[in-house]
């Protein structure tokens, strides 16, 4: 690449293989203002509404009830899995995944035909897949209208993944009144999945790339039992290390580090850790017995373990004890006063869940005088600590105008955060597992599905796979494997969506796409706009590119002063940019002092000449952006030559023997020489 591609397309400022600029992912941060907190609506509008009932009695729901048409039965089949309700759908889905893995275009054709037949017969889950197929242009001509129509039918039939896709579509169009309704339903399902079921709300989205390079550090930690660090930890645990036992128990309980959740193994390691005197395991044992995770549910044992943990100074255990008292589980009877006291103890020790549960008491008026504003403050503290249920309650408040000023945009954003933790988020884990096994095609399909549902990490992962692996990505187009045009267009669309959700590196890639005309018409003005957006997020490479465009008058006014300013800002933002910035400043010096000369015209022509001689240096220069590097390198050599020649002229003038024949040094030349230390 010429501008941006000095680095590897996403994060680095220069793409030559040995230089990378700093990489920083920018998370989306949602902030509540004082106006929101102080100007709330009707504080008395909640009453005893079940909408805000955290402590109500609810029946556990199965995976199929929470996520109809779930893909789990394909990736994690068990004896309880039932596919009889949609045999044609599951058959077609299996074939789609197999075709993506094998790169088998004929099988993919057969699979989509089978799915289409099921869709025409009214299967909502097959209709959801057809919405996906039309959305990306796989085996069918890309059609936003047909995709939208199929997702509507699927959502009406109860498919949650299509509801996610529709909600994100409405969100992108700022149709918050429609988006908020769907996200509210999805968030409620997500909350049910980790409040009622035995699964915990822990999500580990993994960005498989760091810039244009593979994120080797994160991927290494996601290899599960094959990870060398895990094997060392397991060895230490087997030798009696209590801390190692506790950590392994955590990994299995929450399904961390690429491990599948295994509550039985978690229970085994927590019990061994407790035997060795490890107190943190006591609290988790209390939670395990309260949830019935891997054991028969036993609230009496849960209370015993939580009480022991609290005595050991694990103050978050107070929150669990308070919950048992408010529900009347494992104790003589419900006792709201004791529940409040335990929640307050947890709050005094800054436990997020304690803040959340105390907020629920004030919201409902359970054991305390009802105070919605006080509840809001507790929810706010819990949300700042990342408590997903607190985001859910705040979303409801913004949605209904209870306790907070009604704000559908904020409600939608908060609901979305919670909805993305629903059972359908398992697609991310299966995609990562496929990628780690080298099954890039299956990973691409899974990430693309999640991208459609609005997951920013999945959008950038899918786009990166398309860019990084090219033909090896197993990308399927309308009538075969994706052409370069189809692949670039798909990647461009994905980067664009990720950019809209705050991914600064995606904005950088959008600028690249417009600058080089990849996946879209070449447009320097829109490229500059995208780079400006990335620059506003302190992206060094975007600053460099803006300097380059000012220097050459591409999409921005020709302005050498602004060019230098952006080059300098790039270096200030990232010290790794020193070499490219030095080369760029060398080019700028030539342009200032030798404008409209043959020398500058030759330098400017190098990017066009470069492809003709590329075969001569293909073992040295691999990226199109290196044409710019070659150009700047020539500039540097030229400047060094000119400076040396000028230095010799100065020496001649200073020589007393030659003084009588020496000509006075041009003032401009002297000024420029003074600017360069010798």
From Swiss-Prot:
Sel1-like repeats lie at residues 124-159, 242-277, 279-313, 317-349, 353-386, 388-422, 506-537, 540-568. Residues 1-25 form the signal peptide. InterPro entries: HRD3 (IPR044623), Sel1-like (IPR006597), TPR-like_helical_dom_sf (IPR011990). Its main location: endoplasmic reticulum. The chain crosses the membrane at residues 620-640. It is found in: Endoplasmic reticulum membrane. SMART domains: SEL1. Glycans are attached at residues 298, 335. Disulfide bonds: none annotated. GO terms for biological process: ERAD pathway; hyperosmotic salinity response. It is a single-pass membrane protein. GO terms for cellular component: endoplasmic reticulum; endoplasmic reticulum membrane. The keyword Metal-binding does not apply. SUPFAM superfamilies: HCP-like (SSF81901). Belongs to the sel-1 family. Component of the endoplasmic reticulum (ER) quality control system called ER-associated degradation (ERAD) and involved in ubiquitin-dependent degradation of misfolded endoplasmic reticulum proteins. Functions as an ERAD substrate-recruiting factor that recognizes misfolded proteins for the HRD1 E3 ubiquitin ligase complex. Targets the misfolded LRR receptor kinase BRI1. Interacts with OS9. This is ERAD-associated E3 ubiquitin-protein ligase component HRD3A.
């Amino acid at each position: 690449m010429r501008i941006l591609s000095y680095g590897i397309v996403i994060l680095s400022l220069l793409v030559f293989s040995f230089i990378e600029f700093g990489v920083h992912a920018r998370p989306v941060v949602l902030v509540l203002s004082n106006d929101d907190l102080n100007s709330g609506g009707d504080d008395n509008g909640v009453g005893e509404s079940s909408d805000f009932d955290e402590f109500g009695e609810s029946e556990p729901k199965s995976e199929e009830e929470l996520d109809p048409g779930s893909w789990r039965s394909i990736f994690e089949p068990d004896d309880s899995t039932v596919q009889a309700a949609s045999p044609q759908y599951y058959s077609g889905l299996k074939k789609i995944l197999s075709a993506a893995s094998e790169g088998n275009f004929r099988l993919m054709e057969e699979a989509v035909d089978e799915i289409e037949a099921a869709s025409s017969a009214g299967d909502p889950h097959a209709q959801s897949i057809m919405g996906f197929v039309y959305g990306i242009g796989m085996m069918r001509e890309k059609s936003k209208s047909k995709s939208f129509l199929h997702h509507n039918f699927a959502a009406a039939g109860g498919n949650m993944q299509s509801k996610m896709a529709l909600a994100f579509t409405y969100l992108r169009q700022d149709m918050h009144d429609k988006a908020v309704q769907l996200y509210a339903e999805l968030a409620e399902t997500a909350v049910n999945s980790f409040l009622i079921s035995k699964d915990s709300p822990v999500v580990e989205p993994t960005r498989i790339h760091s810039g244009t390079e593979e994120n080797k550090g994160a991927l290494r930690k996601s290899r599960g039992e094959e990870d060398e660090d895990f094997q060392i930890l397991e060895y230490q645990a087997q030798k009696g290390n209590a801390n190692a036992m506790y950590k392994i128990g955590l990994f299995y309980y929450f399904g961390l580090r690429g491990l599948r959740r295994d509550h039985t193994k978690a229970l085994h390691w927590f019990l061994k850790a407790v035997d060795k005197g490890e107190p943190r395991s006591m609290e988790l044992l209390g939670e395990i017995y309260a949830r019935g995770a891997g054991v028969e549910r036993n609230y009496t044992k849960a209370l015993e373990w939580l009480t022991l943990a609290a005595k050991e100074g694990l103050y978050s255990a107070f929150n669990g004890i308070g919950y048992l008292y408010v529900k009347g589980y494992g104790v003589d009877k419900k006792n709201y006063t004791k529940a409040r006291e335990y929640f307050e103890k947890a709050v005094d020790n800054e436990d997020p869940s304690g803040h959340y549960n105390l907020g629920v008491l004030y919201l409902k008026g359970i054991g305390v005088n009802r105070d919605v504003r006080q509840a809001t403050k507790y929810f706010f503290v819990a949300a700042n600590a990342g408590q997903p249920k607190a985001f859910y309650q705040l979303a409801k408040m913004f949605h209904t105008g209870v306790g907070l000023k009604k704000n559908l945009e904020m409600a939608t954003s908060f609901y979305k955060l919670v909805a993305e933790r629903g059972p359908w988020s398992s697609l991310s884990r299966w995609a990562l597992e496929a990628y780690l096994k080298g099954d890039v095609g299956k990973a691409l399909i899974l990430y693309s599905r999640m991208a459609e549902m609005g997951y920013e990490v999945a959008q950038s992962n899918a786009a990166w796979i398309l860019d990084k692996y090219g033909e090896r990505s197993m990308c399927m187009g309308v009538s075969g494997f994706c052409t370069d045009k189809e692949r670039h267009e798909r990647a461009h669309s994905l980067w664009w969506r990720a950019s809209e959700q705050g991914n600064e590196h995606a904005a950088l890639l959008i600028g690249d796409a417009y600058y080089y005309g990849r996946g879209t018409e070449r447009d320097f003005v829109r490229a500059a706009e995208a780079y400006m957006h990335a620059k506003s997020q302190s992206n060094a490479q975007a600053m460099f590119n803006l300097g380059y465009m000012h220097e050459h008058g591409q999409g921005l006014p020709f302005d050498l002063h602004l060019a230098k300013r952006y080059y300098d800002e790039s270096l200030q933002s990232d010290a790794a940019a020193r070499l490219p910035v030095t080369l760029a400043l060398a080019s700028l010096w030539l342009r200032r002092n030798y404008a409209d000369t043959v020398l500058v015209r030759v330098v400017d022509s190098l990017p066009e000449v470069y492809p003709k001689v590329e075969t001569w240096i293909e073992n040295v220069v691999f990226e199109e952006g290196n044409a710019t590097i070659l150009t700047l390198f020539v500039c540097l050599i030229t400047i060094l030559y000119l400076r040396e020649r000028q230095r010799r002229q100065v020496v001649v003038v200073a020589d007393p023997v030659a003084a009588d024949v020496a000509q006075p040094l041009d003032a401009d030349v002297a000024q420029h020489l003074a600017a360069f230390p010798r």
